[in-house]
Regions:
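Membrane-interfacial helix-loop segments of redox and metal-homeostasis proteins
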Residues: 1-156
Length: 156
């Protein structure tokens, strides 16, 4: 198959694309943090820096792409919660306000991209269905986490 021949190039390109958006998110969280979520945003930024490093190091291993898919599924759940209550998700701090739906679609695209790279790295299609199902569960976990954050930090 044409794509499998270029799987290493596709994996590297995917890492670069995802990293660009995550670096923008880190910049927004560190230099333009939401006042009520400042501590959470610093911790998430630290995690995202570690995550970008892991992506670059292990980009040719299928398991990092499964982890990436699950992370973006939970990010999608987080951002859709904020969109549903008409508040910004602060996914990039206050750098780009009121764009929760944009972040949801970006997270969804990165979820699908991660599963696609997982498939290119020789994971069977049946296993991919399992990871997609698990991604739906992580979507719900991200949604529940956002609701908890809303109750604890915003409704004070």
């Amino acid at each position: 198959m044409f794509l499998k021949r270029y799987k290493k190039l596709i994996a590297l390109s995917s890492v670069i694309l995802i990293s660009c958006f995550l670096l923008l998110a880190i910049y927004g969280k560190v230099f333009h943090p939401s006042e009520k979520l400042k501590k959470l945003e610093y911790w998430v930024s630290f995690f995202e820096i570690f995550f970008i490093s892991s992506l670059f190091i292990y980009r040719y291993n299928w398991y990092i792409w499964v982890i990436t898919a699950l992370i973006f599924a939970s990010f999608a759940g987080y951002s859709i919660f904020w969109y549903s209550i008409k508040l910004p998700c602060a996914c990039m701090g206050t750098l780009i306000p009121h764009a929760s739906l944009l972040y949801f679609f970006l997270d969804l695209i990165f979820f699908v991209l991660s599963l696609s790279v997982t498939y290119l790295l020789q994971v069977k299609l049946s296993a991919l269905y399992f990871w997609a199902f698990l991604g739906c569960i992580f979507f719900l976990i991200g949604y529940a986490f956002a609701e908890k954050v809303y109750q604890k930090f915003i409704l004070l």
